[in-house]
Structures are given as C-alpha cells and as structure tokens.
C-alpha cells in the first residue's frame, strides 16, 4: 500500500436518537443515526402490520369498482 493516500481510521461512538450508543471504527469523526438495532421494529420484534386491505377497499369505494 502507498503511504499517505489512505484516510485516517478512527474509533468512533455511534449515537442513536433512542439514546443507544456503541463503538465502531470509521474514517468519520462522529456518527449520528435516527434508528439502530436497539430500536428498529425488525430487531425488537414489535413490527406493525400494514392494513393494505383497507386501502384497497377505499380505492374500490372511491372509484366504484
């Protein structure tokens, strides 16, 4: 590898909007996220089902189908 062409690799704290934080390595100095594995519905098991049937019924009612 050539010297002097690679960016500096730092230890960084990643801070989530939910208050969770964890350490990783990156070329950035700080990382802020809105959602992480501690608060994402897929990882927490608190997924919401989308009511697509209601939307279809509203469409059919609106356009007389």
From Swiss-Prot:
Pfam families: Ribosomal_L31. One of its GO terms (cellular component) is ribonucleoprotein complex. Binds 1 zinc ion per subunit. Zn(2+) binds at residues 16, 18, 36, 39. Coiled coil: none annotated. Its cofactor is Zn(2+). Transmembrane segments: none annotated. Gene3D superfamilies: Ribosomal protein L31 (4.10.830.30). GO terms for molecular function: metal ion binding; rRNA binding; structural constituent of ribosome. Keywords: Metal-binding, Ribonucleoprotein, Ribosomal protein, RNA-binding, rRNA-binding, Zinc. One of its GO terms (biological process) is translation. The keyword Ribosomal protein applies. InterPro entries: Ribosomal_bL28/bL31-like_sf, Ribosomal_bL31, Ribosomal_bL31_A, Ribosomal_bL31_sf. Part of the 50S ribosomal subunit. Belongs to the bacterial ribosomal protein bL31 family. Type A subfamily. PANTHER family: 50S RIBOSOMAL PROTEIN L31, CHLOROPLASTIC, LARGE RIBOSOMAL SUBUNIT PROTEIN BL31A. Binds the 23S rRNA. This is Large ribosomal subunit protein bL31.
């Amino acid at each position: 590898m050539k010297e002097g062409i690679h960016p500096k690799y730092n230890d960084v704290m990643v801070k989530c909007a939910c208050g969770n934080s964890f350490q990783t390595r990156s070329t950035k100095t700080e990382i802020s996220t809105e959602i992480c594995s501690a608060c994402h519905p897929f990882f927490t098991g608190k997924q919401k089902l989308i009511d697509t049937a209601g939307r279809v019924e509203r469409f059919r009612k609106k356009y007389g189908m």
